[in-house]
Amino acid sequence: EPGETPAWERLVSTLYSPEERHKIEWCIGAIVTGESKKLQKFLVFYGAVGTGKSTIINVIMQLFEGYHTSFSAKDLGSSSNAFALEAFRANPLVAIQHDGDLSRIEDNTRINSLVSHEMMTVNEKFRSAYSNRFKTFLIMGTNKPVKITDAKSGVIRRLIDVTPTGDK
């Protein structure tokens, strides 16, 4: 039986257009139903400071309390960071970064493989390397435009971008 969510209705309809709201709720639904483990998508909230990106991300964190972790997109996009996947070692349902930066990703291979749920080699400090297939759905907020260096990269078609209205 459908319930009522007046606080969510008021919050999300103020901060986001109906189209952007649909994207957010679609992603949440995909995570709840387990479809996100098969989908090759990730969610990026892009907008000015103070427009509600972290507000919605905080709600998502509360929904998946105990099933999320934090990550660094900068580390994932750096070919020199051998331990970038260490944050995913527990294979969380959701990985979140409130204030990320995808404007200067030098190598998007790792992000693409992670979002595509491909087998990856994981290096953890003080442990032997091992392989894992992560089923994690990535969510991040950013104030900077996303810039993918390789126009043919799979990251572009996997990105779901959400922009706030700027209303308060």
Each model region followed by its residue ranges:
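Short, polar/flexible loop-turn hinges at active-site or ligand-entry regions and domain interfaces
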Residues: 14-20, 146-150, 168
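A short helix-turn-beta junction within AAA+ P-loop NTPase domains corresponding to the substrate/partner-engaging
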Residues: 151-167
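P-loop NTPase catalytic core of nucleic-acid-dependent motor ATPases
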Residues: 1-93, 160-163
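Short, contiguous acidic/charged loop-to-helix segments that flank catalytic cores in large enzymes
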Residues: 15, 73, 84-85, 100-103, ...
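Substrate-gripping "pore-loop 1 plus following alpha2 helix"
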Residues: 71-80, 109-128
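Conserved AAA+/SF3 P-loop NTPase catalytic/coupling segment centered on the Walker-B
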Residues: 92-117, 130, 134, 148-155
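AAA+/SF3 P-loop NTPase mechanochemical coupling elements
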Residues: 83-90, 122-141
